[in-house]
Amino acid sequence: MSGNIAFGRFDDSFSAASLKAYVAEFISTLVFVFAGVGSAIAYTKLTGGAPLDPAGLVAVAVCHGFGLFVAVAIGANISGGHVNPAVTFGLALGGQITILTGVFYWIAQLLGAIVGAVLVQFCTGVATPTHGLSGVGAFEGVVMEIIVTFGLVYTVYATAADPKKGSLGTIAPIAIGFIVGANILVAGPFSGGSMNPARSFGPAVASGDYTNIWIYWVGPLVGGGLAGLVYRYVYMCGDHAPVASSEF
């Protein structure tokens, strides 16, 4: 793509390749949400409903990191492995995907998240847990989600979207999984560490609990959008070149 924001064309968005990409996003998001929500439910079952402790936080963060690593990897060669409306939004603002195709990515991701959350609730018989604030207000929660999502989408650009990435692209799914796991360790006890509107929306639909759901749309979209704009216009402009290793 040219790197400029583009609306796109319906014939491109409904091509065979695009339809396959939507299916890939649906499946990848379903896999990620099933694993992520399932880890939270498993912790609740194994601890008899005890509050999340440090060991549990690490376990949930690791499961989300591993789950996203796999979800991105299985979709990378088909759809790019976005698995997240905030990632798609950031890539659209950076001109890496058209707005129209991005909308269909969102639909696929949200449907995948809903199905994943409903399936894990059905299989376990346990109410689906949702993201929520703990010890912080709505404003602080939004800021936290902006920061952690900025880090996630910046990582996506640096390891997967930047045409200068070279061999770094081969470890993109690992890096993306690592940053999500690390961010959950930081933000989990406060905002929940969503970074992903679909990850929050799917469980909200499955449980019928939409409390503060707007935080998990506003924060990630602002953070993802900022990361896309910063990386696109600072590092992917025509006159930028990477520093040679001998110059460090």
Swiss-Prot record:
Keyword vocabulary terms for this entry: Membrane, Repeat, Transmembrane, Transmembrane helix, Transport, Vacuole
Pfam families named among the record's database cross-references: MIP
Residue span of motif NPA 1: 84-86
Motif stretch (NPA 2): 196-198
Induction text: Down-regulated by chilling.
BP terms from Gene Ontology: one-carbon compound transport; water transport
CDD domains linked to this entry: MIP (cd00333)
Keyword Transmembrane helix in annotation: yes
Tissue spec. comment: Expressed in roots and leaves.
InterPro entries: Aquaporin-like, Aquaporin_transptr, MIP, MIP_CS
Transmembrane segments: 21-41, 55-75, 87-109, 133-153, 168-188, 210-230
GO terms under cellular component: membrane; vacuolar membrane
A molecular-function term among this protein's GO annotations: water channel activity
Coiled coil residues, start to end: none
Annotated membrane topology: Multi-pass membrane protein
Compartments it resides in: Vacuole membrane
Domain of life: Eukaryota
Primary role: Aquaporins facilitate the transport of water and small neutral solutes across cell membranes. May be involved in transport from the vacuolar compartment to the cytoplasm.
NCBIfam families named in the record: MIP
Family statement drawn from the similarity comment of this UniProt entry: Belongs to the MIP/aquaporin (TC 1.A.8) family. TIP (TC 1.A.8.10) subfamily.
Comment, domains: Aquaporins contain two tandem repeats each containing three membrane-spanning domains and a pore-forming loop with the signature motif Asn-Pro-Ala (NPA).
Name this polypeptide is given: Probable aquaporin TIP2-2
Taxonomic lineage from the root: Eukaryota, Viridiplantae, Streptophyta, Embryophyta, Tracheophyta
Gene this chain is encoded by: TIP2-2
